[in-house]
């Protein structure tokens, strides 16, 4: 019906400009309408509310609108937005409904399997708890990424203290010398060709080895790149092995004495600093972002000026490219924002990427929130993935730095309520 279509469009426009008004009036507007129209109206407002969290903040009425729209087919994007809203507010039955509304491929992703288990165990009955435990066990055995590590924690497993250290054979290293793609990449590197060319050639060589499931060749390439100090490409190759892994290449620890010393001087965990540095620059000291952040810890010039002032130093733009100074400033700044954000490393990690004010704005204002819920509900996808990656990296670095068996949740304390100042 055209009239209903116009109404849905009009309510969508209202929600775009004044979400609170749309949420407050949606039940009054829809009360005498056919059920499918009511669902469409609720879905429209729920979707807009879920995609404008950066502007409007979190609102339980947005989740209610999604709940009221249940029964209509969900697009993959709508289902994910619904799931994250439900996760944010701990509405576990809604989490299950949202995941059930996803495509088969989508719901089989590790993140949604993890949240299906998290939601199922909240039901409390033996069947649901057993189903959740089976999912956790499967995830715990299938990898060592963020959701795999969380799953290990849920069933009481600690991440093993002996990181994989598979070495390439002599034969693998001989084959590396003969591989035309890797030979070109190393030749370009040796003549200091522009990074765009060396990286392109390297990535192509890695892709060919990966498509052949040639872990030995990938490890040989990673070892040689690591020995050359070409850490970002060593990581790129080591990340793509399927059965044979070497985490000293995958989680490189260059400048270890410097990182450990400066981290300890400001009271932060060196494994966390390494986890962040790996995510920021892959240890490319000359890395420069499109917004001007530079160096190993990708420090913005204004941040460097602030840190220099706090440390009683005169700011020098060249400091960003000096390895020692970049690490010293980066660890100081990370410690500084951690102190501003309830001494919580998850909040500080989000703040390092998106700014401390945003990380604080995303804190709950109604009750404390588990760190995995906070992380999954971060409205910026870049920051959401960033926090997951840094926490995962830090867990692996904890092992490599001799900190013993790791529990990722020990790095992710509960997120406190936001203090209104």
Can you annotate each of these PLM segments?
Residues 1-4, 109, 177-180, 188, ...:
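Polar helix-capping/helix-linker motif
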Residues 12-13, 48, 52, 85, ...:
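Residue-level signature for tetratricopeptide repeat
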Residues 4-9, 43-47, 76-80, 114, ...:
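Alpha-helical tetratricopeptide repeat
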Residues 21-39, 45, 54-57, 61-85, ...:
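Catalytic glycan-binding domains that act on GlcNAc-containing polysaccharides
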Residues 1, 144-162:
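Long, contiguous interaction/recruitment modules in multidomain scaffold/adaptor proteins
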Residues 152, 159-181:
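Alpha-helical solenoid repeat scaffolds of the TPR/TPR-like class and their adjacent stem/linker regions
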Residues 5-17, 177-204, 208:
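Alpha-helical segment of the N-proximal tetratricopeptide repeat
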